[in-house]
């Protein structure tokens, strides 16, 4: 499986964020998008997810499910946690499991992998910011999708939770998944490729 982006140009509000951006990510690879605020990191992810239209270029996933669209094979996690505050953690994940093609049996294991089995029956409004973020991250594993698009996924996470999520990401890569993540902070993914956005022609290379 391979994610291929070719000659991507994105404009917003009359401003060109980037132009002629091309990259690939193979099964088992992570691609980390870096750059200053306003360089277009979030917009790139939203374009890959199909929420924004690129002015030029295209994106495709080769070797995935032949009858499914790119979006149907993608998990997108943005800045917002996308949780209902009145519902419990388990109820929120149950909703997303149904929406994304998972099942109710996947909810408890997903919470456990993020260190949250004890909050399953707590309303989300009673959780801390870090716990809410972990519930949102658990959405990635209640339904199997090969491509993960993650925008600042470790926001509000403490060191321990960051380590837990790094393990989740590594497990996804080990099973042949692909991750594209925009971040200002290290994600604990050794050997990840990098794309640096600067609001001008970009470079793609290996992360240090």
Go through each PLM region and give its residues.
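Conserved ABC ATPase signature
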Residues: 123-130
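Conserved ABC ATPase "signature" region
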Residues: 104-120
């Amino acid at each position: 499986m391979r994610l291929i982006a070719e000659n991507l140009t994105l404009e917003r509000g009359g401003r060109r964020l980037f132009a002629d951006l091309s990259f690939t990510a193979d099964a088992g690879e992570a691609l980390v998008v870096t750059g200053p605020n306003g360089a277009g990191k979030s917009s790139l992810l939203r374009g890959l997810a199909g929420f924004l239209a690129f002015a030029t270029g295209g994106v495709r996933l080769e070797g995935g499910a032949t009858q499914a669209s790119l979006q149907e094979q993608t998990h997108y996690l943005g800045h917002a946690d996308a949780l209902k505050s009145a519902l419990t953690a388990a109820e929120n994940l149950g909703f997303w499991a149904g929406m994304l093609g998972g099942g109710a049996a996947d909810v408890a294991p997903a919470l456990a992998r993020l260190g949250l089995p004890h909050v399953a029956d707590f309303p989300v409004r009673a959780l801390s910011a870090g716990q809410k973020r972990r519930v949102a991250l658990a959405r990635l594993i209640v339904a199997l999708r090969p491509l993960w698009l993650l925008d600042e996924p470790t926001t509000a996470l403490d060191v321990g939770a960051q380590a837990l999520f790094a393990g989740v990401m590594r497990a996804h890569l080990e099973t042949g998944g692909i991750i594209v993540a925009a971040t200002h902070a290290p994600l604990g993914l050794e050997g990840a490729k990098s794309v640096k956005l600067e609001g001008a022609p970009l470079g793609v290379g290996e992360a240090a």
